[in-house]
């Protein structure tokens, strides 16, 4: 399984751990993925991995669409 958001495509980033002595070692910064059920247009549900920031945006867009109706 890849550690990638299925909606936005966000994936791991590479950075450094930096000690007080300024020693640097490589590290990976992983996205905050959540497994959520999404209802498709035909009524079926599908479980996908979505980044928490993307999930927040999706909820905001859904609330705006509901308020517009």
Curated annotation (Swiss-Prot):
Protein name: Large ribosomal subunit protein bL28
Keyword field contains Isomerase: no
InterPro entries: Bacterial_rp_bL28, Ribosomal_bL28, Ribosomal_bL28/bL31-like_sf, Ribosomal_bL28_bact-type, Ribosomal_bL28_sf
Source organism of the structure: Sulfurovum sp. (strain NBC37-1)
Keyword Isomerase in record: no
Any GO BP: translation
GO cellular component terms, A-Z: ribonucleoprotein complex; ribosome
Family, as annotated: Belongs to the bacterial ribosomal protein bL28 family.
Origin superkingdom: Bacteria
Any GO MF annotation of the entry: structural constituent of ribosome
Keywords: Ribonucleoprotein, Ribosomal protein
Stretch list, region Disordered: 1-27
């Amino acid at each position: 399984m890849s550690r990638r958001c299925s909606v936005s495509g966000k994936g791991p980033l590479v950075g450094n751990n930096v000690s007080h002595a300024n020693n640097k070692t490589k590290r990976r910064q992983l996205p905050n993925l959540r497994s959520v059920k999404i209802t498709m247009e035909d009524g079926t549900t599908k479980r996908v991995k979505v980044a928490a920031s993307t999930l927040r945006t999706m909820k905001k867009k859904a609330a705006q669409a509901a308020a517009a109706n």
